[in-house]
Amino acid sequence: MRKLFLSVMLAASTYVSACTNFIVGKDASADGSVICTYNADDYGMFINLCHYPASKNAPGTMRQIYDWDTGEYRGQIPEAAETYNVIGNINEYQVTIGETTYGGREEMIDPSGLIDYGSLIYLTLQRSKTAREAIKVMTNLVETYGYCSSGETFTICDPNEAWIMEMMGKGPNSKGVVWVAIRIPDNAISAHANQSRITTFNMKDKKNVIYSKDVVKFARSKGWFNGKDSEFNWNMTYAEPDFGGRRFCEARVWSFFNHFTDMTPYIDYAEGRVKGAKPMPLWIIPDHKVSLQEIEECMRDHYEGTPFALDNDIAAGPWDMPYRPTPLSFEVDGKKYFNERPTSTQQTAFSYVAQMRSWLPRQIGGVLWFGNDDGNMVAYTPIYCGNTVQPECYNTPGADAVTFSDKNAYWVCNWVSNMVYPRYSQMFPSLKVVRDSLEKSYFESQASIEKRALELYLQGDDVAINYLTDYSNETAQQMLARWRQLATYLIVKYNDMAIKPEKDGKFERTETGQGARVHRPGYSDTFKRQIAKFHGDRFAEPVE
């Protein structure tokens, strides 16, 4: 998503919306999958799970381009002769593309460019069979028709390779772009979170590094770089990290890496206060093979157990809420303060963990584990890459950003999560039980579902595709039904800041059939002490 940013010359930026991507190479994962993720974070954003069916198009067919963020019509381009099936951010060849916006130099934005970053993703998914082809398609499109967005980091993956590409325009009324794409080693993990991550790169490694021919020349022409080509540093030239870029953005990358290796040497960098602190590498080698379930947990991260944890300061409130309202920065009596910005955040519109597997037929190998809210507050459901119809709950007629529907996953999941946020430590355990039980059932069923799909595949790929489409849609609808039950359970269980007792999964009653006496837990001891410290004797009872 886009972030509002000030000039790179300012000491701090204002990050209003932001996203997070994690990447796992095939030899770094527990089962040989390439894995990548995307939290699409933006206040007020309402996005359906999109579907673009495969098509063959006559010469002269035109494709209309609408800005992905605003819906504004930008123009049209010739449609490809053939396009591939796309559902969400994965296509039928298991190519998956995500992004995070880092902004960079404002003077490099070209408002007249035809294609925005979001449109670029979905155009490319419809036209690419591999990650390398996707890089070629993306760069050709923006070089031909212009690029109107600010600096972007793209995750581009297929069943065999994972890449990071960073791109920026060349300024007003210029169709050109500068860009660098780097392949993540198969045994490594990487991440990006709204701060440019590419620094120096090996221009001689043609197999694993691809870049625009003028990536250095353009910087020289602007007076932004005058060293040797081999010394050229992408983000120090085009998007130098400031305090906000490090604390609000790079800290999320630090926390992800910290799950899989000791990141203590880089804590000064992530904290953002120490100038000249050693920056983090683009990738690390994890200390063990990483499972899909672990990556889902990383999408739910709030810096737990680190110096950046959100559940142990006064802003967590009485019930240890690891979420903070925005703006992230605020001012008190002329002094500026800030809140932490974790991976899991309330403004997530959708979240996915994509799984790409080279050893299976492509329509079976690609799975988008999808949720329509904050990853911490949803059960990810499987959407197979060849699916031809979205679940109704992820594409609900009549539901939108200002129209609630109890048939829509975004609204039902937000209904639940917004009950839980203010009383997190009390209510979240109830949500977690339901979430984890659903996901456990999906993972336990995956092998048998895919075994049956392989049997049907022998009868024809359409038979397997229809089977997986039906399975994905049924699973998503079952999740929605369970989440509606959870919503009504929570309002009964935790009504009026009290807790109703249960026995054997049922609310207890008295002998006369009335509801049993509720439990009133009050504040935690920690919060009581905070009240006493803040107010002194204001609420102290007199000693009799």
For each predicted feature, which ranges?
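Active-site rim segments in enzyme catalytic domains, especially the processed small/beta chain
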Residues: 32-83, 315, 319, 325, ...
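A contiguous strand-loop segment
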Residues: 19-117, 137-290
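Glycine-rich, aromatic-lined ligand/substrate-binding cores of catalytic
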Residues: 218-371
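Sec-dependent N-terminal signal peptides
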Residues: 3-13
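Histidine-centered catalytic/metal-binding microenvironments
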Residues: 436-544
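Substrate-recognition/cap regions that form aromatic- and gly/pro-loop-enriched pockets
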Residues: 318-456
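Sec/Tat signal peptide C-region and signal peptidase I cleavage site
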Residues: 14-18
